[in-house]
Amino acid sequence: MMNLQQIYVYLKESFTKKTQGRKTNDITKTADKAFYSVGDYFPNKESREGIVVFDGSDGRHPFTICGMKFQAMTKKCKGEEKRVVEFTFKEALRKFPTFFNHSKDEWYIPCAEELEQMARMVDEKKFPARIFAHLWSCEESDFMSTYLAKSISICSTNPACHDCHCIDSKKEWKHKVLLFRQIN
């Protein structure tokens, strides 16, 4: 299995026209309230698992996430009702298994054993405590954002210690950082 420091989790989002009226790259800088207008990640105290939430459906159209369609549900987020699709981080790993291999400089789909090993590490709380996601928003499109979540070992005294990998240097991308937090 690859070293987790060499893995990027790649989630490609396609949103409905509902997101056009919002600033899709807005984000708070507070780690505990990490939230952006088209998605969220927060601890689920009942299950002790993190939840990845994709928000942006207007209720008439299903979400398209990594080419797969999902029907949204109504849920209260940050005190207001939103149409959302949610997964645990472990589910997201299994549903969207596309990774970036730094040593070979290419995208690849890992084998089942690798996915199961990563899922076990999440179960056993051996996954890195902090997971950073980089939000890249293309200037030319209001419908699509690309998420790169990098699983890395972070210096506890410097949670901002990380590096970035631009997936397309030919386009003008806006770069924002979202902190994904894993419950220890």
Predicted feature locations:
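Extracellular adhesion/carbohydrate-recognition regions
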Residues: 7-107, 145, 150-155, 170-180
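C-terminal, surface-exposed recognition/capping segments
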Residues: 112-184
